[in-house]
């Protein structure tokens, strides 16, 4: 019960892999992968942009002009992305999402990953 209540008040929406695909296709969502560079190169969601958590924030140049655009944060498991999503919501970003379960959930859904930068 606590988890469900916390989910309602966190300010961002969690997405399943299929929902992420729909959001990218229908609303041109910006997908930001907060994984370490070497993990990103081993496999990431096509079209996602890699930003290290230490240099990520509402003022990051990648997010310039994206306050009303859907922004989906992704990491390996969903933990890092959740913390970053809260910062974006606080800064006034309207449509902030996190891929529930991260890249691991994407792989479990048998969806493809791209290697390299």
Where are these regions (language model features)?
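Rhodanese-like catalytic fold shared by cysteine-dependent sulfurtransferases
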Residues: 1-19, 23-29, 37-70, 76-117
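Active-site flanking residues adjacent to catalytic metal/cofactor-binding acidic residues
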Residues: 32
